[in-house]
C-alpha cells in the first residue's frame, strides 16, 4: 500500500526500480509510474518472481515446446488456505480494500501474471464475480465471543487464533518481541488485545472470500481463474 510514492521518488532520483507487486493502489497510479519512468528514461520492473521458479519454468518450457499441442483453455485454481486467509485477509493487514487492494490483486497478482506469461497474448474480454460470503457477523456460531481467548467453543473452531498462533506457532514470524518479554508474553497480549486475537466473524474485513475471473485472450484462448480460500 506504499509502493507508489517511494517508486516515484526513486524514478526522480534516476534509479532503475525493481518494484514489488502490486504496483500501486489503482490504475491511475500504475499508469503514472509507467509514464513517469518513460519520461525519465529509467526501467521499472515488477517483481513477479514465480516466473523464475524451477517449477513454473518447467511448465513454461513444456507449453512453449508444443508437447501439449495448441492451448485452447486453462482452468486455474488459486487455493489460499484457511490459515493464510484468517491471518492476512480476515484479521490482518490485507483485510480491507481501501487499506491495501482488492483480494484478486493482493493475492492473485502472480497467478494472473503466470497465465499471461504462459499464453503470451493480451486479454481482450473479462468478467469477474465474488463476494464476502462467510466471514460475517451473522455467521458467527452460537456461543462464540468477540475474541478467541474468551470463546466457549474455541477448541472446536477451525479458525481459532489461540490454536493458530499459540498452540501451533504458525504465522508469527512478524510479531516483534521487545526486550524483557517472551514470545508467550507477546502472543497472549495479542490474543487478548490485538487484531490477531479477534473472532473471524467479528472483524472489520471487507475483501471477498471467493472470486472467479473469466478471460478471453486475443487469440481466443479462454482462461478461468478461481480464487478459493476454503482449502488446505
Each predicted region: which residue ranges?
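Predominantly a Rossmann-like dinucleotide-binding segment in NAD(P)-dependent oxidoreductases
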Residues: 50-197
Amino acid at each position: 500500500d506504499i509502493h507508489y510514492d517511494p517508486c516515484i521518488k526513486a524514478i526522480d532520483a534516476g534509479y532503475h526500480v525493481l518494484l514489488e507487486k502490486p504496483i500501486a493502489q489503482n490504475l491511475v497510479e500504475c499508469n503514472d509510474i509507467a509514464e513517469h519512468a518513460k519520461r525519465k528514461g529509467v526501467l521499472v520492473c515488477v517483481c513477479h518472481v514465480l516466473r523464475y521458479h524451477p517449477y513454473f519454468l518447467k511448465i513454461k518450457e513444456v507449453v512453449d515446446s508444443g508437447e501439449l499441442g495448441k492451448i485452447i483453455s486453462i482452468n486455474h485454481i488459486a487455493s489460499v488456505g484457511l490459515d493464510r486467509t484468517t491471518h492476512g485477509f480476515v484479521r490482518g493487514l490485507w483485510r480491507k480494500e481501501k487499506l491495501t487492494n482488492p483480494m484478486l490483486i493482493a493475492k492473485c497478482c502472480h497467478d494472473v501474471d503466470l497465465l499471461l506469461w504462459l499464453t503470451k497474448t493480451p486479454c481482450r474480454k473479462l468478467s469477474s464475480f465474488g463476494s464476502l460470503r462467510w466471514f460475517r457477523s451473522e455467521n458467527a456460531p452460537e456461543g462464540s465471543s468477540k475474541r478467541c481467548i474468551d470463546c466457549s467453543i474455541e477448541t472446536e473452531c477451525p479458525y481459532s487464533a489461540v490454536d493458530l498462533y499459540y498452540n501451533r506457532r504458525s504465522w508469527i514470524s512478524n510479531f516483534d518481541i521487545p526486550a524483557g518479554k517472551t514470545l508467550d508474553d507477546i502472543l497472549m497480549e495479542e490474543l487478548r488485545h490485538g487484531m490477531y486475537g479477534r473472532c473471524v466473524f467479528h472483524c472489520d474485513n471487507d475483501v471477498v472470500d471467493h472470486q472467479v475471473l473469466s478471460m478471453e485472450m486475443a487469440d481466443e484462448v479462454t482462461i478461468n481463474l478461481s480464487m478459493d480460500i476454503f482449502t488446505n
